[in-house]
A protein has these predicted regions:
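Structural preference for beta-rich elements and adjacent junctions enriched in aromatics
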Residues: 1-345, 349-350
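Outer-envelope beta-barrel architecture signal
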Residues: 72-74, 116, 157, 174-178, ...
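A short, polar/proline- and glycine-enriched secondary-structure boundary/capping micro-motif
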Residues: 85-92, 129-132, 170-172, 267-269, ...
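Catalytic-domain carbohydrate-binding cleft regions of carbohydrate-active enzymes
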Residues: 161, 179, 250, 255-256, ...
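Short beta-turn/strand-loop junction motif enriched in small, turn-promoting residues
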Residues: 164-168, 231-233, 365, 452-454, ...
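Surface-exposed extracellular loop regions of Gram-negative outer-membrane beta-barrel proteins
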Residues: 217-254, 343-396, 518-529, 548-567, ...
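Exposed, low-structure sequence patches enriched in small/polar residues
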Residues: 313, 321, 391-647
């Protein structure tokens, strides 16, 4: 079948870099009711016209937005002209993920340098999502909330929103030029469009010119989240725990967060898949203290000098993070397990120009017999589509002595092509004790490249192919490993997605290979989909078969099921893992959930009731232990009561 012609992707000099949007102060704030009345937004700045975020092609449907502010709030409204029958609007709550929903998002960077930004999303039912600069834990009192009202219309949908200045990442009060963008996700195209086509370069986002940022009242208070937990087990063993999380905004745009006896009673740890690996794997971090401001603590990429999962037991912790000024970001953290371990982290990055960025970090582990220090100094320089980088890391360990890791490379990133050519060397004694660096003692040259296009083949939304090559030797010259891999994926307009993968290589004395094929339908609906992947492999001279099945199903508008099943046969030995999760909303702020985990012949389940996601007291009732290998007969109750403390 012949290719359809497609307009050429704009080069860097022809990006859709919009003119500054004047920051308009309104004397009469609009009413937030979802009705964009005639003349209601006439004082505001209005714009229209959106471009495909990946290709720069203009949208074939129309949308417009309004933006203004006063001393208390930022006001944002939008109207989308589309088929209302094709809208996806599953969510109706506040501060939730809007993935897969039709939505508009306002991206706002008050410092105006492209170092970060906050995002505020609204769907056609008025549900909201907040993604604040630096990362936040799911605590309404800390994240904040904003009001939005939306409605479907005969010509599409529209919304109005009021965003308090108090929840926006802080900037010094006074007149400034901020940066912004507006993104629009269309479920009928499974595609995202933006007001400015910048190829994801925030330094090129349009200016919101002449914003007079007000002094935010109330930021000098301590926000306290004390909690209490009581529980009883089958053997009548009584459990209890109390603790406190606290936060305060500091002068100059920094935030202070602390914890005493951290609240992780009902935190469900991530579950690792059954994938094969020669090296250690690390599950994701789910504890709120470490999630808060996590993007300010950058201690590496492939190798991380600090991995919070290494500090599994902490009694207290404190961190300070934020934007020191428009070009400088910092984070400082210390956690302690009294009588055993104190871990500390410092991270600093600076954007010297739109092209040049440098960063440094220092990590220290104070522990008897296990003392460790680690540091890094990184820099990158971007010219057009090409970025040159140098990453250096050093460690000094009480047992392993001194070591280093150095990576240098060049990245080319265009609308269709991505390529990364890198040289890496890691000494045998490189050892970040409270970090994550599973490979040591090698020199490697590697290349990864990917090519992809959108809407160039009839019936195909997007397709892509990738290739990776690498060769590694030990420091003494001995062979270590060679790898080659290829992948391909395609997403059809009917919602069906396919993927293929092949890899082959030699790891020390073993000759390995793997071939996989996967399918998802529909890939553009996170609430209702099925997926399957099967792989045929040979590792360590042994045959392996993997089968993974997954299901997401929206039983009712308030009930969601999620199921994943993994089956592995490795050299005649079988292994299985199943995770079943069911959630049901009793209201905007109430819900029940159930999780069942089966690992071979071990079963664990837990059920819970929650009253959370709103301002005020939160309550949780938990049956079982979510992180036990097998079922624990336990009944527990937790209460969290927010407070404020001013001086």
């Amino acid at each position: 079948m012949p290719y359809l012609p497609i307009a050429p992707v704009a080069p860097v000099n022809d990006l859709q870099l919009r003119e500054p949007l004047p920051a308009v102060v309104v004397s009469s704030p609009p009413t937030i009711d979802g009705e964009i009345g005639e003349g209601e937004w006439q004082e505001s700045a209005r714009r229209e016209g959106f471009y495909d975020r990946d290709t720069g092609l203009p949208s074939d449907e129309r949308a417009e937005f309004w933006l203004c502010y006063d001393g208390k709030n930022i006001y944002f409204a939008g109207r989308v002209y589309t088929d209302p029958k094709k809208l996806v609007a599953e969510e109706y709550r506040q501060n939730v993920s809007l993935g897969g929903n039709d939505q508009m998002r306002l991206s706002l960077d008050l410092l105006g340098q492209g170092t970060g930004g906050d995002e505020f999303g609204i769907n056609p039912r008025g549900a909201t999502e907040i993604e604040l600069n630096g990362g936040r834990a799911a605590k309404t009192e800390w994240v904040g909330e904003f009001e939005a009202q939306a409605k479907r219309t005969e010509t599409g949908w529209q919304f109005e929103a009021r965003i308090p200045w108090q929840i926006v990442s802080p900037a010094p009060a006074g007149l400034r030029d901020a940066r912004f963008d507006v993104e629009w996700f269309r479920s009928n195209k499974s595609n995202t469009y933006s007001y400015a086509y910048t190829r994801d370069d925030r330094t090129r986002n349009p200016q919101w010119a002449g914003v007079n940022v007000p002094k935010i009242e109330g930021n000098d208070q301590f926000l306290l989240l004390p909690y209490a937990f009581v529980g009883v087990r089958e053997d009548e063993k009584f459990e209890s725990q109390v603790g406190l999380d606290f936060k305060r905004q500091l002068p100059g745009g920094l935030s202070l967060v602390g914890t005493i006896n951290p609240d992780d009673v009902n935190i469900e740890n991530d579950i690792l898949s059954l994938d094969f690996s020669y090296f250690e794997r690390l599950a994701g971090e789910t504890r709120p203290f470490f999630q808060e401001g996590q993007n300010y603590f950058r201690t590496g990429f492939e190798a991380q000098l600090f991995a919070s999962q290494r500090t599994s037991n902490i009694d207290t912790g404190i961190k300070i993070y934020g934007d020191v000024d428009a070009t400088t970001r910092m984070g400082a953290l210390a956690v302690a397990d009294f009588g055993d371990q104190v871990a500390s982290v410092f991270s600093l990055s600076r954007r010297w120009s739109p092209q040049l960025v440098t960063s440094l970090a220092y990590v220290r582990n104070d522990q008897t017999g296990l003392y460790n220090e680690a540091g890094q100094l990184n820099s990158s320089y971007t010219l057009g589509d090409t970025t040159y980088y140098l990453l250096t890391q050093f460690t000094d360990d009480e047992q392993q002595r001194s070591g280093s890791r150095i990576s240098s490379g060049v990245i080319m990133d265009t609308a269709k092509w991505y390529a990364d050519l890198e040289y890496t060397e890691v000494t045998p004694n490189f050892f970040p004790r409270i970090g994550f660096a599973p490979e040591r003692d090698f020199r490697r040259v590697g290349l990864f490249t990917r090519y992809g296009e959108q809407l160039t083949i009839p019936g195909v939304l997007e397709w892509g192919v990738g290739l990776n090559l690498s060769s590694s030797h030990r420091f003494n010259g001995a062979f270590y490993r060679d790898d080659v891999g290829a992948s391909a994926d395609v997403s059809l307009l009917n919602g069906l997605g396919f993927s293929l993968g092949y890899s082959a290589g030699r790891f020390e004395q073993f000759h390995d290979r793997s071939f996989s094929i996967g399918a998802t339908y529909p890939y553009n609906d996170p609430y209702r989909l099925v997926r399957a992947e099967i792989a045929w492999s040979r590792f360590q001279d042994r045959e392996r078969r993997d089968l993974e099945l997954g299901l997401q199903y929206r039983v009712t508008p308030f009930t969601q099921l999620s199921l994943s099943n993994e089956f592995v046969e490795f050299d005649g030995d079988a292994e299985t893992q199943m995770v079943l999760v069911a959630t049901h909303d009793l209201g905007k702020f109430e819900g029940v959930s159930f999780r069942l985990v089966r690992r071979n012949y071990d079963y664990n389940w837990n059920a819970s009731y929650r009253l959370s996601g709103r301002r005020g007291t939160e309550m949780f009732l938990i049956v079982g232990d979510p992180n036990s290998r097998t079922f624990t007969n336990r009944l527990a109750f937790k209460i969290v009561t927010p407070m404020t403390l001013g001086f």
